[in-house]
């Protein structure tokens, strides 16, 4: 499955103006892939992962990563591939940003300026993995 990265980025940037990183990343990927799930269900699935888990901006994993991991699971049919991709998604993000922790990336939620770029970066990685 080939995902159009330009459309993917546009969707994520649009959603990120009013949704969380986990919601924006999951929805951008699933919509670009035409995955059959409603926006409402994607938001319900992803909303608890916002702000490093429940909006705590604490030690929880960045929502861009959790959104990407959820999309990876939906867009792949093979469980071993999903697990291998998950490890690659996690490690790629950590290598790029030095951490996967929301609190470290956002200064405990005080600076969300890196968020949209984090979402786009990791969503494009998922697109590459899905295209394999």
Show where each model-derived region lies:
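DPxDG-like acidic metal-binding loop motif
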Residues: 66-75
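Membrane-inserting effector segments that mediate pore formation, membrane fusion
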Residues: 59-67
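Acidic-glycine-rich active-site phosphate/pyrophosphate-binding loop
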Residues: 1-4, 26, 31-49, 94-100
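A short glycine/serine-rich beta->alpha loop
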Residues: 8-16, 50-59, 107-111
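C-terminal binding/interaction regions
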Residues: 2-3, 82-132
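Short cysteine clusters
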Residues: 21, 62, 102
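Active-site-proximal helix-loop elements at catalytic-domain edges
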Residues: 7-35
